[in-house]
């Protein structure tokens, strides 16, 4: 079957790889000259199934109000009063209760765990290299309340069979030695030993090269103008002056998927702006071993080979991609506080990207209201964590194979009535 994939980020390229493995004739289209130049370019680098959780959680509405008056708040909202923003925020608010949180986190962990397994199998099959580490991830708590609140997530982890370790402040240095110097600032941590890290952009480009060798065609530097639809079927993709025709189509354009589909149906995918710093590594002993996640500021600090990636923040500001110096201040503050000697922070590169977020945190993976159009978008802050699993799942669905995990609750049907 001829399949066109819109988007060459980590989700689109992973989907292309798995579809090619099923024998499909795959073409990937993207407006950028190379794969992984937008949201996949500078993310935090963590592959963290156990930390997969929706931003819509009990207490978030009240926290959001408090964060409005804090200098280093992890979430900032700039209302533009557009229907898209207001509708998305209202739907998110409706998911901020304990029942929805438990349901949403459980299915996110299910997909993320599956994705981690798919990545490990891909690594065994291909030997792909992307500065990956299998050292687990560590969530750091600065208050006793954060430490106590971890029991809510631990219950979901236990139900999903995800191994974990709840550590006191004195045990943190046993897994992240450099934290010994700042232990007095922390109350403890939650460690997930099976989580991983790696450079998402490097992975995506390596996988794209392997996909090309497997027969996937990449049409890069092509702007998708619109879908051509007749009845309930997509009949082509208009790119500049070229119409590209296939038997099936996959929408993997992240936050931009919403606008391309709006003429036919709405999907609740909205951009959540994030930031990162990439710092040259100066001292191994003063740097993290893997990934640590500061729960207070929602900032992750990840070790690559000779670089440190510091990523986080969330701004609800539409499609604005300006670099906000205040966000750099927050990222620098967190890394200076925890790893002050890891590298020359003043030499860091500063990046921003738009994560495609759904109100309930779960991506849209599967069929759409158009018969031959499939969705693989809305992964939010977890695109790298969920990419391989989402790609394999979508390839199975499109190929009329039974998915290896429950997938019905991942489709857009939970929103489109």
Curated annotation (Swiss-Prot):
It catalyses: a D-alpha-amino acid + A + H2O = a 2-oxocarboxylate + AH2 + NH4(+). GO terms for biological process: D-alanine catabolic process. Pfam families: DAO. It is an enzyme of class 1 (oxidoreductase). InterPro entries: DadA, FAD-dep_OxRdtase, FAD/NAD-bd_sf. GO terms for molecular function: D-amino-acid dehydrogenase activity. Keywords: FAD, Flavoprotein, Oxidoreductase. Its EC number is 1.4.99.-. Its cofactor is FAD. Signal peptide: none annotated. One of its GO terms (cellular component) is plasma membrane. It comes from the Bacteria. Oxidative deamination of D-amino acids. This is D-amino acid dehydrogenase. It comes from Pectobacterium carotovorum subsp. carotovorum (strain PC1).
